[in-house]
Amino acid sequence: MSETNGPFRIGIGGPVGSGKTALTDRLCKAMRERWNIAAITNDIYTKEDAEFLTRSAALAPERIMGVETGGCPHTAIREDASINLAAVDAMNARFPGLDLVFIESGGDNLAATFSPELADLTIYVIDVSAGDKIPRKGGPGITRSDLLVINKIDLAPLVEASLEVMDRDSRKMRGEKPFLFTNLKTNLGVAEIVAFIERQGGLSGV
């Protein structure tokens, strides 16, 4: 069931290497049997993430589109989202009745956010290997995203990061906004993220 004004658009952001492409891959595979889905990835000078999704068979190749943003990936999702809006329109024309479009940002810093014109729902991915101080550093991705995903929890002992500290700081920085600990390598947390997307997109029980 697509939105009256087009598909429900989920923006997935976060620093380089945090697990954005892995999350996009897992969500596509978990939801593609129930929903009409496309994915758009943003890279600075390549289409590497789109190629990864194609190789992993997250979706059929024609449902995956790579966008080259140039040197400022945050601009393409915030200040001038026209290149991504055009990509969404192209996918919507290619697949009438599209339910969901995942839009993965290029790796950027904690200040990057999606324009509300581009994304109906935002998921921000950080990872434990960057240290347990990341949630308390704040930034729009940490504090304003609809869902914060704290990935790679299996690495916590190796980098001496405290999940308890990250839990406490995430609650403090986000207030009532939800967050989840995940290990995308093993699909831990994926079902909860799927349920969140379906609930927020009015897709549950359809």
Curated annotation (Swiss-Prot):
What CDD domains does the annotation carry?
A: UreG
* A GO molecular-function annotation: GTPase activity
Keywords on record:
Chaperone, Cytoplasm, GTP-binding, Nickel insertion, Nucleotide-binding
State one Pfam family annotation: cobW
UniProt-annotated binding residues for GTP: 14-21
Q: What's a GO biological-process term for it? A: urea catabolic process
Q: Which InterPro entries match?
A: CobW/HypB/UreG_nucleotide-bd, P-loop_NTPase, UreG
| A GO cellular component annotation in the UniProt record | cytoplasm
Q: Where in the cell is it found?
A: Cytoplasm
Nucleotide-binding as UniProt keyword: yes
Which family is this sequence assigned to? Belongs to the SIMIBI class G3E GTPase family. UreG subfamily.
Cite the record's note on assembly.
Homodimer. UreD, UreF and UreG form a complex that acts as a GTP-hydrolysis-dependent molecular chaperone, activating the urease apoprotein by helping to assemble the nickel containing metallocenter of UreC. The UreE protein probably delivers the nickel.
Q: What does this protein do?
A: Facilitates the functional incorporation of the urease nickel metallocenter. This process requires GTP hydrolysis, probably effectuated by UreG.
Any idea what this protein is called? Answer: Urease accessory protein UreG
- Organism equals Methylocella silvestris (strain DSM 15510 / CIP 108128 / LMG 27833 / NCIMB 13906 / BL2)
What phylogenetic lineage does the species belong to? Bacteria, Pseudomonadati, Pseudomonadota, Alphaproteobacteria, Hyphomicrobiales
